[in-house]
């Protein structure tokens, strides 16, 4: 069902769109915390884990409400599958943000230049997705532009990821360095997976925009 048939100028946001906005904002808040930690802005690893976990819990609650409302609502402003999948991918982004820090803590891995770039770019992608969801009702074409920017940023993350992996293999010349490489590669993969989810969220937004304009 097209969004233009449900929304009118000046009307309050539909509850599903508002829940998606709230969820995207929580994800952005979490990635803001992560990016600041990578820039060494006086946040301890333990404190970051607690704060990221709190954001994750808040976002999960929003998603639970959204799914419950989907079950109890006959007519939705967007296709049910699109609402569900967009919420899922946004949720996964924050989950991977948390598990990135958790894995770094468990594997005793410090941040490096590649991780700093990847996380900063992911934070920007999350910001574009949050803007896309906010513009979806009144300005779907603008929402599509933000979704395309998010996809471009995801491509940048994957390029940094490939460069980082290549550099790791070049440095691994003995057993200890090999173990370090394997641990660090695991962290890179967490951020790469986060980027994949951002790309999937952007794809869903693109499909929504095509249906409503």
Regions found by a protein language model. Give the residues of each.
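Cytosolic, long alpha-helical scaffolding segments
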Residues: 1-213
């Amino acid at each position: 069902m097209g969004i233009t048939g449900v929304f009118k100028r000046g009307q309050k946001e539909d509850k599903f769109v508002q829940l998606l906005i709230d969820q995207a904002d929580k994800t952005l808040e979490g990635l803001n915390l992560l990016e600041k930690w990578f820039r060494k802005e006086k946040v301890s690893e333990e404190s970051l884990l607690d704060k990221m976990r709190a954001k994750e819990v808040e976002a999960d609650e929003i998603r639970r409400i959204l799914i419950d409302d989907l079950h109890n609502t006959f007519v939705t402003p967007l296709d049910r599958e699109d609402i569900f999948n967009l919420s899922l991918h946004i949720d996964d982004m924050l989950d991977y943000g948390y598990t990135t820090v958790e894995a770094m803590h468990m594997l005793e891995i410090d941040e490096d230049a590649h991780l700093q770039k990847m996380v900063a770019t992911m934070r920007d992608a999350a910001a574009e997705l949050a803007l896309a969801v906010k513009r979806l009702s009144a300005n779907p074409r603008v929402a599509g532009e933000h979704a395309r920017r998010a996809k471009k940023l995801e491509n940048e993350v994957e390029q940094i990821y490939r460069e980082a992996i290549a550099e790791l293999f070049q440095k691994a010349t003995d057993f200890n360095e090999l173990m370090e490489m394997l641990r660090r590669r695991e962290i890179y993969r967490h951020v790469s997976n986060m980027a994949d989810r951002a790309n999937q969220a952007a794809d869903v937004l693109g499909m929504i925009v095509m249906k409503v304009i």
